[in-house]
Structures are given as structure tokens and as C-alpha cells.
Amino acid sequence: MGRLIIAEKHSVAQAIAAALGGGKAEDGWIGCGADAVTWAQGHLVDLLTPDEYQDRGWDKWSMDALPLDPTGGWKWKVNRQRGADRQYRVVAGLLKSDAYDVLVNACDPDREGESIFHRIVSYAGTRKPMLRLWVASLEEDAIRNALDSMRSEDEYRGLAEAADIRAKADWLIGMNASRAYTLVYHRRM
């Protein structure tokens, strides 16, 4: 069995593959012996927009519909921009493959990197053991050292939760304020 290593960017995935001894480039991933390295291409999974909550009637802009509040029923979707949906399908297929028994988060070492990884894994519905590859440099020796000192992904879970809380707060404030301001502004014209 092998490890599925998910980087945030293609360039980081290439550097990790090189540190693993190179590999065979496939469509959206790199095979490195029993391991595979793929990339997220940024945010592959995002929150729905208000219009996409079909059951809430938020597609009509009115003050009566405010505040928009999906709390308790937040929904996620695959990002359809810049070919992200195609890359998501590649990553999801690898996540579901029996060839990989351990997932490795090699996304950027920050809250957003944690969030990007966890959104993909959660949306794909995968439950496998997870490790964290904390890469601070793309030098091969630094990557090899990081590969030798990986820790449980659980130790970094708080970073992903903080990023998701920020994303939901941004959504609540941004979507409600934008609609309220637009509706009030158009009434005055």
C-alpha cells in the first residue's frame, strides 16, 4: 500500500515527487513507486452561494429574505473555475483508490492549506489515516527531512477549523451586507 500526498500547488507536487526520487507524470498526478503525489490547484471545494441554496428562496433579492443564514446546513460544492472541477475528479478518484492507505496533507503550512486539504477529503467522503507534511522549503533535502518527520494530521485540525469559521463568517457578513446595501441603494435611486 502507498501514500497519497496532496499538495496545494502543482509546483509543490513536482518538488515533492523529485524528493521521492522522481516519478511518472500522469493526468493530474505523479506516480512515485507505491506513492502518488497530486495537487489541489487552490480551493477545489467552496461554500455554495445564496442562489445555490434552492430550498431557501434566496435566489430572489429582498429585504424580507435577510439575514441569509445557512447555519446548521452549510453546503459545499466543487469549484467550477479554471478547470478545478477536472482536477477535483482526479484527486477524488485517487482518494477513493484502494492503492493508498494513508493520506498526506502537503498543502501550504497555514490555516488555508489545512482547510483546502480537509474540504477535499471531506467532500470526497474518504476516511483514511492522515499525516501532515509540513514543508517550509522546496529544497529536496528539506522535503526529505519533512517526509521523515511527519506528524498526525489531528495535531493541525484546529487550523482547518479556524479557516472554515473565517470562511463562514466572511460569507455571512459579505453576502448579507452586499445584498442589504444593494437593495437600499437601488431604493434610493
Features from the language model and the residues they span:
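Intrinsically disordered, low-complexity regulatory segments
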Residues: 1-185
